[in-house]
A protein has these predicted regions:
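Short functional hotspots at interaction and active-site rims
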Residues: 1-185
């Protein structure tokens, strides 16, 4: 991280620290607890249709800014597109991108844009990535107990989730500002 800060300073640019991850969303819903009147048992439709799309996301815990991209799958080509979107969105800044060691994040075919530096988390440590908490928030607040009839409905729900997160930077900061992150900034 120190090297990334020095490199950004040499180039006269601001360093933005972001955490990235991807999550799978689809028609196979997970039933979650919910409130119901006393004496009644809530009914929730369930289905076992295995169709999925992926939501790539990056979060800046310092200011709560997020970037999302809906993709058909999770592979190196999709991750490459996401990196290019990030690089363009923050073209005047350097980005230290903290991520897990998934194979599509480490592929030799991956061309990392000039303003992005990758920093890998230790293996098997999703608890260190605050982006994971945002996936929980999306699943709890937007996808809770829905049986979606089509992949278009899943996409529409994802767009609703993106708007919910992007409109609430204060919430994002409260979910993602882990002490070890805030103290290092």
């Amino acid at each position: 991280m120190r090297e990334a800060k020095r490199a950004a300073a040499r180039r006269g640019r601001r360093l933005r620290i972001m955490f990235v991850d991807e999550a799978r969303f689809g028609r196979m819903n997970r039933i979650r607890p919910c409130w119901a009147p006393i004496g009644t048992r809530p009914e929730v439709a369930a289905q076992l249709i295995r169709e999925y799309i992926y939501l790539y996301g990056a979060v800046s815990p310092k200011d709560g800014i997020c970037v999302y991209l809906i993709m058909p799958t999770s592979n190196t080509a999709c991750f490459q597109v996401f990196l290019e979107v990030l690089a363009r969105k923050f073209a005047r800044q350097d980005i230290l991108l903290v991520l897990d060691g998934a194979p599509n994040h480490r592929c030799s075919d991956l061309a990392v844009p000039n303003n992005i530096t990758l920093l890998y988390l230790p293996p098997y440590s999703p608890e260190l990535n605050p982006k994971e908490n945002l996936w929980d928030e999306i699943r709890e607040k937007v996808f809770k107990n829905y049986a979606l009839k089509s992949m278009d409905a899943v996409r529409a729900k994802l767009k609703q989730a993106i708007l919910y997160i992007e409109r609430n930077p204060k919430l994002v900061r409260s979910i993602t500002s882990f002490p070890y992150i805030v103290n290092s900034l």
